């Protein structure tokens, strides 16, 4: 995890989309590798949930699949395929580096929920990264 002013996709050789700098704010970004171990496609941008906590302050995370020159929460990951996922939130610069930072990423444990929208009632595992 790191603080950045802008978020770029992996392919910036031609036309691409990115998340631009906003005055007085920074993105807290985690780039993670997601492997779909299921037997059908998955929509990790829709069916997973992320949250950040910085020194007790809570922020909702956004989950975007890095698809070359673009990002999107609607991109799917085929069975047995791997994708890079950008999990991020926009925070005021005043909280940047102000204490322990934690990312919690909740992923359903049952494949039947991997093609819909996330619900707290789904059985899920929480993966936590702390810095």
Regions found by a protein language model. Give the residues of each.
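Conserved functional micro-motifs across diverse proteins
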Residues: 1-131
């Amino acid at each position: 995890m790191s603080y950045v002013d802008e978020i770029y996709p992996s392919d910036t050789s031609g036309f691409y989309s990115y998340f631009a700098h906003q005055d007085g704010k920074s993105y807290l970004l985690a780039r993670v590798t997601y492997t779909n171990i299921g037997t059908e496609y998955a929509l990790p941008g829709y069916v997973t949930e992320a949250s950040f906590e910085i020194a007790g302050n809570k922020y909702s995370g956004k989950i975007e699949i890095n698809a070359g020159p673009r990002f999107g929460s609607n991109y799917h990951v085929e069975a047995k395929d791997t994708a890079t996922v950008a999990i991020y939130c926009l925070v005021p610069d005043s909280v940047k580096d102000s204490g322990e930072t934690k990312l919690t990423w909740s992923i359903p444990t049952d494949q039947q929920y991997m093609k819909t929208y996330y619900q707290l009632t789904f059985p899920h595992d929480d993966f936590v990264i702390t810095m």
